[in-house]
Amino acid sequence: MLKTVHQKAGRHTRPVRAWLKLLWQRIDEDNMTTLAGNLAYVSLLSLVPLIAVVFALFAAFPMFSDVSIQLRHFIFANFMPATGDVIQRYIEQFVANSNKMTAVGACGLIVTALLLMYAIDSALNTIWRSKRTRPKVYSFAVYWMILTLGPLLAGASLAISSYLLSLRWASDLNTVIDNVLRILPLLLSWISFWLLYSIVPTTRVPNRDALVGAFVAALLFESGKKGFALYITMFPSYQLIYGVLAVIPILFVWVYWTWCIVLLGAEITVTLGEYRKLKQAAEQEEADQP
């Protein structure tokens, strides 16, 4: 009886073990941690230019002036670790200084922000091992669309939420809306990762695989935020060593950890499809044998 149970358990866990082995092999071959380090470096160089461009877009639309403040607080509260308030103050100072730049400097900011998107495109297509390339004009159009429409859609969403909360007839729904807002960061992360894994690769990505990889990445991202905040609170060694400058290594580590999660989600998405193909090929080979 016990032997039968072990045999059945082994049959069920064997595919999982094989998939995990394939996942680990892909992570090692793609040098995922090195890719994450490269993206973290580019991200830190592009962070202020990217935020400056986004806030400049909001400034161009007076209707989003109030929403831009809400969006800033939402991003730093939900997509940064516990030191998000300190990081927010520094970044807002940098952005305020960038507003004094000339037209040539502003173009440089835009180019730097677009370089981050190019680096993301290159890293994900390395993981998917796609040899296809998009036309440069098409790639620029996609990057610019993400850079402009993304923040505007997020701002419109927050504006609609604020409007609904201000309505008297919606007062009974405030509890429901509050509960939805609690899981909103997870949902936004899931949707963002899904779009990233579906649109950026130059090869076809099965929607089911992208959803699974994005969900795992979103869970790890939200768990990582809480774990990172707990580590900073329980083991404040950075503050003891670096003092006022502690925010710098904290931001470095957080950005690197975030890119590790993003690329891990991409590896999961890739290996789900690859494992399915390998399994089908093995079954076909076994069926063809006399």
Curated annotation (Swiss-Prot):
Species, as recorded: Salmonella paratyphi B (strain ATCC BAA-1250 / SPB7)
Protein name, as recorded: UPF0761 membrane protein YihY
Family: Belongs to the UPF0761 family.
Location(s) in or outside the cell: Cell inner membrane
Protein's membrane topology: Multi-pass membrane protein
TM spans (from-to): 44-64, 104-124, 140-160, 183-203, 210-230, 244-264
Family annotation (PANTHER family): INNER MEMBRANE PROTEIN YHJD, UPF0761 MEMBRANE PROTEIN YIHY
GO cellular component, one term: plasma membrane
UniProt gene name: yihY
